[in-house]
UniProtKB/Swiss-Prot annotation:
GO biological process: amino acid biosynthetic process; aromatic amino acid family biosynthetic process; chorismate biosynthetic process
Originating species: Helicobacter acinonychis (strain Sheeba)
Binding site for substrate: 33, 57, 80, 132
Gene (name only): aroK
Cellular component per GO, a single term: cytosol
Name the UniProt record assigns to this protein: Shikimate kinase
Amino acid sequence: MQHLVLIGFMGSGKSSLAQELGLALNLEVLDTDMIISERVGLSVRGIFEELGEDNFRMFEKNLIDELKMLKNPHVISTGGGIIMHDNFKGLGTTFYLKMDFETIIKRLSKKEREKRPLLNNLTQAKELFEKRQALYEKNASFIINAQGGLKKSLKQALQFIA
């Protein structure tokens, strides 16, 4: 079995689904944003503000190479922009959590949105969302309709794996 890699726009439920998949399949769960935050000692927002997005993307790209070296399969929850890296391909079996922009914004509280620097300007965030959708679809082994909530997303993911 390869890594099970969850991709999708920020707020689409990747972290929550990763936890549930990990439990269901008895696999360790890794979260790329959390790993980077712990290593740098700053939140993702802090990294963006103090070190810049380019440095965050460099940390992310280096982490992809590290994850490819792991022997055992993991469930990996990724940051929304991870698919922009040329070394992303081959990380594992990818599941795109597809959800419309309006639903994502409704799901995230104001406090949650404040943690995500790329959601500061909703017009720009929607443009980014639309730009990335094609990349998510292109890089997806499977597409999960995440509109129906966590239980339905988990059921779809497990059916794809079976």
